[in-house]
Amino acid sequence: MVRGPKKHLKRVAAPHHWLLDKLSGTYAPKPSPGPHKARECLPLIVFLRNRLKYALNGREVKAILMQRLIQVDGKVRTDSTFPTGFMDVISVEKTGEHFRLVYDIKGRFTVHRITAEEAKYKLCKVKRVQLGAKGVPFLVTHDGRTIRYPDPLIKVNDTIKLNLETNKIESFIKFDTSAQVMVTGGRNMGRVGTIVHREHHLGSFEIIHVKDALDREFATRLSNVFVIGEAGKSWISLPKGKGVKLSITEERDRRRALKGLA
């Protein structure tokens, strides 16, 4: 009889966006319980060893972490399987590097370097707003944070700008047409665009129509949309490609053009 949670994760069952090859072992790192879901996170060991190449194996990753050199959202993390996720800020003290976890146009976490100034804040999507004990208002964000006494104008699906040093809300963006968004789920994952139209469907999913920088329109569910800026201006720096998805022929032409320049 099976008792308790699973403590192992087979390599073939690991999320595809971790980009682990099947022949390098039987098992993959099992994410610890934390602020992000297991299928939507990137364990610290995968980020440091497989993406940054700062370590050759898990033992070296553990040695780096136990020196308390790695911070996630301003807090030192020593757990090699700590689940980092979308919008998290990872800082490496020795090198002075800062990274923000965002998706590329293929829906994978990309190594996106940011400045020290940008590393002082992160954006959080509001998942819930309600009253707690003794009538205290609070909100819950996509990364599991609970913030008491928020601005009464902040509603569900809005995005807050959180100062990681003070853990206070600096500003917020309303979820509305003309807001700039990044898609965090579905087949359009990683694409960036502007909200054009919102379809309301009672008893079903609300559909959001988004137009990207090339004036291509696509639709996705409301739950897959994360507001990252106001009209025409993103509050965070974007990775290479700026969230614009090219067709197969356009990617081919761009590769040929780059090869011709080389």
UniProtKB/Swiss-Prot annotation:
It comes from the Eukaryota. GO terms for biological process: cytoplasmic translation; translation. Pfam families: 40S_S4_C, KOW, Ribosomal_S4e, RS4NT. Residues 42-105 form the S4 RNA-binding domain. CDD domains: KOW_RPS4, S4. GO terms for cellular component: cytosol; cytosolic small ribosomal subunit; nucleolus. It is found in: Cytoplasm; Nucleus, Nucleolus. InterPro entries: KOW, Rib_uL2_dom2, Ribosomal_eS4, Ribosomal_eS4_C, Ribosomal_eS4_central_region, Ribosomal_eS4_central_sf, Ribosomal_eS4_KOW, Ribosomal_eS4_N. Transmembrane segments: none annotated. The modification Phosphoserine is found at residue 223. GO terms for molecular function: RNA binding; rRNA binding; structural constituent of ribosome. Keywords: Cytoplasm, Nucleus, Phosphoprotein, Ribonucleoprotein, Ribosomal protein, RNA-binding, rRNA-binding. SMART domains: S4. Belongs to the eukaryotic ribosomal protein eS4 family. HAMAP family: Ribosomal_eS4. Component of the small ribosomal subunit (SSU). Mature yeast ribosomes consist of a small (40S) and a large (60S) subunit. The 40S small subunit contains 1 molecule of ribosomal RNA (18S rRNA) and at least 33 different proteins. The large 60S subunit contains 3 rRNA molecules (25S, 5.8S and 5S rRNA) and at least 46 different proteins. There are 3 genes for eS4 in S.pombe. PANTHER family: 30S/40S RIBOSOMAL PROTEIN S4 (PTHR11581), SMALL RIBOSOMAL SUBUNIT PROTEIN ES4 (PTHR11581:SF0). Component of the ribosome, a large ribonucleoprotein complex responsible for the synthesis of proteins in the cell. The small ribosomal subunit (SSU) binds messenger RNAs (mRNAs) and translates the encoded message by selecting cognate aminoacyl-transfer RNA (tRNA) molecules. The large subunit (LSU) contains the ribosomal catalytic site termed the peptidyl transferase center (PTC), which catalyzes the formation of peptide bonds, thereby polymerizing the amino acids delivered by tRNAs into a polypeptide chain. This is Small ribosomal subunit protein eS4B. The gene is rps402.
